[in-house]
Amino acid sequence: MTAILPSTAATVNTGFLHFDCVGKTFPTPRGPYVAIEDVNLSVQQGEFICVIGHSGCGKSTLLNLVSGFSQPTSGGVYLDGQPIQEPGPDRMVVFQNYSLLPWKSARDNIALAVKAARPHLSTSEQRQVVDHHLELVGLTEAQHKRPDQLSGGMKQRVAIARALSIRPEVLILDEPFGALDAITKEELQEELLNIWEEARPTVLMITHDIDEALFLADRVVMMTNGPAATIGEVLEIPFDRPREREAVVEDPRYAQLRTEALDFLYRRFAHDDD
C-alpha cells in the first residue's frame, strides 16, 4: 500500500526547511482574503519536494514565503532554525519565464551571479565555477550566445545553471518547465535530477504536472483549493535513486500513485464549474 500521509505527519520541528502553522492573508477591497492557513511541513536537508494543486491553491504564496519576498500573517517559515525574513543567496528561484539579462551572454548571466554571491573566490576560481555549470547543463558551446539566440530549453538551462552556481541551500523552482514542449521538458527533468544528485540542494518545486512530480520528488505535497488552502495530503515517493524514467513509469506503484494524486485533485478537490 502506498504511503499517503496527512499534513500533520510532516510537522516535526527537526526539518531543515520548516513551515510552522503558516497562514497568509491579503487585504482586498472586499475584505481580507485568506490565501493559506495552518500550513505545517518539515523538509529535510537535500530533500526534493514537489507541490501540486489547482490554480489559486497557494502554491505561489508558499514560494514567496520561502524566498523571503513575503512574510506570513501567522506562524513562521524557518530555514535551519532561523526565521526567513528577507531574500538571500541561500535561496535561489528559477521562474518559468527564464529571467535572464537579455544583453548578456549565457556565460555572463551565470558569471554575474557568481561574482555577486561568491566574491571570496578568485577570478580564476569564479571562472572555473562558471565553466563547470555550463558543462553541467550542456551549454559550453553556446556560452557566448545571448538569450534571444537561445531556445526556450537552453534559456532554462542557463537559469538553472545560474541558480546552482552560487551554491544555494534551497533551490526554488516555479513551474520551470511549464512553457516547454514535451520532449524538451522530459530532457530537462532528467538533467535537473542529474545536477541535483551532484549538489543535493534542498528543492521546493511548484508544478501542475503530476507525472513530473512523481518522477522528480521524494515527496509530493498536495494542496487543497483556496481560499484558506492548506496541505491536504503528502505522497511518499518510493522509487530508488538515481531514477530512470522507463523504470519509474513501468513500476506498478507509479500507476497507483498517479491514480491517488488524480483522485485528490480532480475528485475530492475539483473546482466547481459554476
Swiss-Prot record:
It holds the Pfam family ABC_tran. It is a peripheral membrane protein. InterPro entries: AAA+_ATPase, ABC_transporter-like_ATP-bd, ABC_transporter-like_CS, ABC_transporter_ATP-bind, NO3_transporter_ATP-bd-like, P-loop_NTPase. GO terms for cellular component: plasma membrane. Keywords: ATP-binding, Cell inner membrane, Cell membrane, Ion transport, Membrane, Nitrate assimilation, Nucleotide-binding, Translocase, Transport. Disruption phenotype: Mutant requires high concentration of nitrate for growth. It grows normally with nitrite or ammonium as the nitrogen source. Residues 17-250 form the ABC transporter domain. Its EC number is 7.3.2.4. It is found in: Cell inner membrane. One of its GO terms (biological process) is nitrate assimilation. It catalyses: nitrate(out) + ATP + H2O = nitrate(in) + ADP + phosphate + H(+). ATP binds at residues 53-60. GO terms for molecular function: ABC-type nitrate transporter activity; ATP binding; ATP hydrolysis activity. Gene3D superfamilies: P-loop containing nucleotide triphosphate hydrolases (3.40.50.300). SUPFAM superfamilies: P-loop containing nucleoside triphosphate hydrolases (SSF52540). Part of the ABC transporter complex NrtABCD involved in nitrate uptake. The complex is probably also involved in nitrite transport. Probably responsible for energy coupling to the transport system. The complex is composed of two ATP-binding proteins (NrtC and NrtD), two transmembrane proteins (NrtB) and a solute-binding protein (NrtA). Belongs to the ABC transporter superfamily. Nitrate/nitrite/cyanate uptake transporter (NitT) (TC 3.A.1.16) family. NCBIfam families: ntrCD. This is Nitrate import ATP-binding protein NrtD. It comes from Synechococcus elongatus (strain ATCC 33912 / PCC 7942 / FACHB-805). The lineage of its organism: Bacteria, Bacillati, Cyanobacteriota, Cyanophyceae, Synechococcales. The gene is nrtD.
